[in-house]
Amino acid sequence: MSERKFFGTDGIRGKVGSGQMTPELALKLGWAAGRVLSRSGTKKVIIGKDTRISGYMFESALEAGLSAAGLNVMLMGPMPTPAVAYLTRTFRAEAGVVISASHNPYYDNGIKFFSTDGSKLDDNLELEIEAELEKPLECVESHLLGKVSRIEDARGRYIEYCKGNFPADQTLTGLKIVVDCAHGATYHIAPAVFRELGAEVIAIGDKPNGVNINDKVGATSMAKICETVLTEGADLGIALDGDGDRIMMVNSRGEVIDGDQILYILACDAKARGVLRGGVVGTLMSNLGLDLALQALDIPFARSKVGDRYVMELLKELDWRIGGENSGHILNLDHGTTGDGIVAGILVLAAMRRQNATLEQLTAPMEMLPQVLVNVRFEGEHDPLSSDKVKAAQAQVESELGARGRVLLRKSGTEPLIRVMVEGDDHNTVLAHANLIADAVKSAS
């Protein structure tokens, strides 16, 4: 496969106004994508965005480029990423476009595409779009220009879709839930979903102003929701990220429930109902406690590279349905084509209702093992991981940890860093082991 110049593993992303994230590139990208997508299908594209102030600028640029290529554009306004995937499917659009940088600060933004079935755009189509980007922009004749319309009921459609994932014979009546929307795309969606299902909802992070997305709130900043759950005496908390494709939860004691624990809940519930197909896909960073807890239930577990794209690839390869990352990207292919924080939360709440259990009770059988991550900077072209000294240190630690421990060494994809991760039963022991390997890496670099 050819090297991609613009598209990364999750579309195009960067600081607004520099590099690739400029209005000029967005316009040209819209045109190039339009040229590729107009070769077949409905010639209809949906655009959604999160709440960043730059979203308006990029939306206008993409809209102009797509129209210049002859495609009709349907605007959703601020909507979660999984909502774009869902409505792309239901409108039979040729593609969906999301303008978002997910959990990044407001001064970053990104553009990614969904195919007509709501899945990430095929690599080959991305390469075709990149090839068109190299060509001069040529507008279609005036009578062939695309038209632009707005999906006025996008919010209501997606709210009903989310609620449809909860058992029809159950409600959330009696539950007090704190919902943190990260001042992002779910601010006008998530609180309504859980309220309409019967819960008492305390919403935080629900007042976006264009520059406060993910600012000390949301799934990557859990302190505020943990505090709010305790002060409000809530049963649990649900924290979403800026574009709504990631979830973290909080139990009534104010303790964080991460993506690994959510996967455990969903797998146990699916097995109890006899609907678990195969096993569960995690990543190289998934806690060993998840692996061991699933083993105890005879549920297979497989690890992919880090990134929800790779989780999806392995799910499809194994023909399994449930997978995700400890960071909160949760995939359940029986309930959607992409990570969806609101739907994942609904599925956990459904498990609680079916089993008449609290979040604490559902996670109790899974023991999260202490995990230490040490980053070691190195210089030069030499790969420290090929050093005999590093290999010997790793072998020594793995031998001492045995079956209830794990070592992972990997290079950062963006910086000259070696990431040393060690898991085991005792935090102090794990920390000592991680430092032992880190020292070996330093001496080898």
Curated annotation (Swiss-Prot):
Protein modification: Activated by phosphorylation.
Residues modified as Phosphoserine: S102
GO CC annotation: cytosol
Active site (catalytic residues): S102
Highest taxon in the source lineage: Bacteria
Residues that, per the record, bind Mg(2+): S102, D241, D243, D245
GO molecular function, one term: magnesium ion binding
CC cofactor: Mg(2+)
E.C. number: 5.4.2.10
UniProt keyword Metal-binding, yes or no: yes
Cofactor note: Binds 1 Mg(2+) ion per subunit.
InterPro entries: A-D-PHexomutase_a/b/a-I, A-D-PHexomutase_a/b/a-I/II/III, A-D-PHexomutase_a/b/a-II, A-D-PHexomutase_a/b/a-III, A-D-PHexomutase_C, A-D-PHexomutase_C_sf, A-D-PHexomutase_CS, Alpha-D-phosphohexomutase_SF
Keywords in alphabetical order: Isomerase, Magnesium, Metal-binding, Phosphoprotein
Catalysed reaction equations from the record: alpha-D-glucosamine 1-phosphate = D-glucosamine 6-phosphate
Record bears the keyword Isomerase: yes
Gene Ontology biological process terms from the UniProt entry: carbohydrate metabolic process; peptidoglycan biosynthetic process; UDP-N-acetylglucosamine biosynthetic process
Recorded family membership: Belongs to the phosphohexose mutase family.
NCBIfam families: glmM, PRK10887.1
Described function: Catalyzes the conversion of glucosamine-6-phosphate to glucosamine-1-phosphate.
Protein name per its UniProtKB record: Phosphoglucosamine mutase
Source organism: Shewanella sp. (strain ANA-3)
